[in-house]
Amino acid sequence: MKKLLIALISASLFQHASAKDAKIELTGNDQMQYNIKAFEVTEGQKVVLSFKHIGQLPAVAMGHNVVILAAGTGVPAFATKCAPAKANGYIPLDEESKKQMIAHTKLLGGSESDVITFTAPAAGDYPFICTFPGHFAIMQGVMTVKAK
């Protein structure tokens, strides 16, 4: 009984240590720049992404979001599909687009913030962009997912 209890406690501690969340803090500003262009997580890891628009301008003039795309998604083609989706914060709702997105924040104006949580997908490189019209050309980066 004592050995079983020790084994269960050890397994619980190991599981807790290996399940550590990845905490990512991204900002976007009125100069259309993210503070970081790349970050790294491990497949299967819980990712908590905090995004803050540190500029002053409102969302209608200089809105920013973070959209993490599936590996292999063509960024310019995806961004083009976002432009007409103003009513949804420039997030397209068609099924193909939904399959191309891993996660996304809300569209934010100056001083606003959002937090999203998702599970890191399989190992690979996943682009992230701002889908406000025209921003993707400058506001983009890569989430690298490492194998376990």
Question: Where are the regions a protein language model picked out?
Answer:
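Extended, low-complexity, turn-rich repeat/linker tracts enriched in Gly/Pro/Ser/Thr and Asp/Glu
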Residues: 55-59
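Sec-dependent N-terminal signal peptides
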Residues: 4-13
